[in-house]
Amino acid sequence: MLSRTIRTQGSFLRRSQLTITRSFSVTFNMQNAQKRSPTGIVLMNMGGPSKVEETYDFLYQLFADNDLIPISAKYQKTIAKYIAKFRTPKIEKQYREIGGGSPIRKWSEYQATEVCKILDKTCPETAPHKPYVAFRYAKPLTAETYKQMLKDGVKKAVAFSQYPHFSYSTTGSSINELWRQIKALDSERSISWSVIDRWPTNEGLIKAFSENITKKLQEFPQPVRDKVVLLFSAHSLPMDVVNTGDAYPAEVAATVYNIMQKLKFKNPYRLVWQSQVGPKPWLGAQTAEIAEFLGPKVDGLMFIPIAFTSDHIETLHEIDLGVIGESEYKDKFKRCESLNGNQTFIEGMADLVKSHLQSNQLYSNQLPLDFALGKSNDPVKDLSLVFGNHEST
């Protein structure tokens, strides 16, 4: 009886000691986090005009980007002004038709905030984590965000590309712009940067898309559900960019394949491409053309915007109002919900950032080749200038 009492008391003391130790550890980490400068988690994207009146500035910034549209730097700004002025009335009308502006800033700020909340709990060694958004062509521009980070005393930051699939014209452009702002605003290198430059097969990304597709399939009549064609639609690229060896098409295809694997290849599917403009050859097949071709031949068709992490004009207007809304087969067509505030997706983002922070890897092993192949008038000559010495893991 006495020995049992002693064992019970000993077990109680050990559990109490463990609880106190854990409590002390959490308190100690929280106190340390309060003393540390914040780790900036910066979601990089192209952005979009939050208000209709911001449309011209957005278009000008876009057409003036030599990484996106590689033409003679001597004439680019003049041409950008002309094209932006010409296209503004049409694009303003489209933004009015989807509610008066792009929702991309709203969703990006929400995603960044939620990711940082999770990271403060799961990755206390780099806490506190502070959310930022840096857009390439709309407010808040990279320069504006960088100035705010300096004011906030950020010493370490992760540039988190919201293009899951690398292209020199998108993620590459954001990195080049980051380098320009480092030179202009932070020559003493107050902030130490690393980058998540691609994540096409991230588990949370794949799972979130799979969940959304499965949910949307339930809206089709049961007899045709397994026959519904899944059209994965990504923003197209000019073929002259594709022919440089740009990684984008292969990485988009990797995402699609992983999703279909998750769904056990139950439905027929295709990868198609949207948003091409101008007379130059673009990567195809084109979303709208394939949809109209398949319309009379299939029992149902679902559009999945695969290269976007939230809704914006390409989903809300081009697909919803254009491809679906103007089709005579619209009764057969549905669009899968975008990722937006999907909790599975946000948790996947947080896991990705946590792994990145703990790896001490500054950028992926693919990035130097991406920049060697990319074409630009003002590129980063050496990635170590932006991110320091690359330590491969």
Curated annotation (Swiss-Prot):
Gene3D superfamilies: 3.40.50.1400
EC number: 4.98.1.1
Modification after translation: The leader peptide may be processed in two proteolytic steps, first between Ser-23 and Phe-24, second and by a different protease, to yield the mature protein.
Transit peptide: first to last position: 1-31
Subcellular location: Mitochondrion inner membrane
Domain of life: Eukaryota
Keywords: Heme biosynthesis, Iron, Lyase, Membrane, Mitochondrion, Mitochondrion inner membrane, Porphyrin biosynthesis, Transit peptide
Example GO biological process: heme biosynthetic process
Pathway(s) this gene product operates in, as recorded in its UniProt entry: Porphyrin-containing compound metabolism; protoheme biosynthesis; protoheme from protoporphyrin-IX: step 1/1
Membrane topology per record: Peripheral membrane protein
Main location: mitochondrion
Reaction it catalyzes: heme b + 2 H(+) = protoporphyrin IX + Fe(2+)
Entry annotation: catalytic residues: 351
Other notes: Ferrochelatase interacts with protoprophyrinogen oxidase, and associates with complex 1 of the respiratory chain.
HAMAP family listed in its UniProt record: Ferrochelatase
Similarity annotation: Belongs to the ferrochelatase family.
Biological role stated in the UniProt entry: Catalyzes the ferrous insertion into protoporphyrin IX.
Protein name in the entry: Ferrochelatase, mitochondrial
